[in-house]
């Protein structure tokens, strides 16, 4: 069961500062600026992927913007995960999103039932799916639905961030 999360902003007195919210979520632009000058928001209070590693990447991004630097943090390669059994982890574009973005995609999907280690461990339920740009052969995204998916997604995020492919 996944129950989801919600932003907990009630105690921040955002209304007194004039910061716009919607259903408890702080509204920001593409660079985490709120509608009030010099007030930025990151992490769970802005909704989206509510995970510590995502908030840390957002914090690094915003700190550099405030300091007048552009650090090149690519928030599109920050993985997401769901701690279910089996786990779900993803990074980059799904097949559908890649197609909608105009890519001609090629997809590789590997069922865990065909993996010896998974069979021995009795954890053959699941798959690994990789989405590539058919023209350049570069990785566009990955989805893992398997035991320890959240432990393995980092390597695929690294490959995606570095423009690696087949």
Placement of each model-derived feature along the sequence:
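FAD-site-proximal beta/loop scaffold in flavoenzymes
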Residues: 1-66
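Short amphipathic alpha-helical segments
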Residues: 38, 78-79, 140
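A conserved FAD-binding loop/helix module that cradles the flavin
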Residues: 42-99
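Flexible, glycine-rich terminal cap/loop adjacent to redox cofactors
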Residues: 83-166
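Solvent-exposed alpha-helices and their adjacent loops that cap or buttress functional pockets
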Residues: 33-34, 38, 74-75, 120-122
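Proline- and acidic/polar-enriched loop/turn elements at helix boundaries
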Residues: 26, 78, 110-111
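Small-molecule pocket liners
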Residues: 24, 79-80, 128
């Amino acid at each position: 069961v996944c129950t989801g999360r919600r932003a907990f902003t009630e105690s921040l007195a955002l209304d007194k500062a004039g910061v716009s919210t919607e259903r408890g979520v702080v509204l920001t632009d593409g660079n985490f600026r709120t509608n009030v000058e010099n007030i930025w928001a990151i992490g769970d209070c802005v909704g989206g992927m509510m995970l510590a590693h995502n908030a840390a990447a957002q914090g690094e991004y915003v700190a550099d913007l405030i300091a007048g630097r552009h650090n090149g943090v690519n928030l599109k390669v920050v993985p997401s995960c769901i701690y279910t059994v089996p786990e779900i982890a993803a990074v980059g574009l799904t097949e559908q999103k890649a197609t909608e973005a105009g890519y001609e995609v090629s997809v590789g999907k590997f069922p865990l039932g065909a993996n010896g280690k998974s069979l021995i461990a009795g954890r053959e339920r699941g798959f690994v799916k990789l989405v590539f740009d058919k023209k350049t052969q570069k990785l566009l995204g990955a989805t893992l639905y398997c035991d320890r998916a959240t432990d393995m997604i980092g390597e695929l995020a690294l490959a995606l961030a570095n423009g690696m492919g087949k």
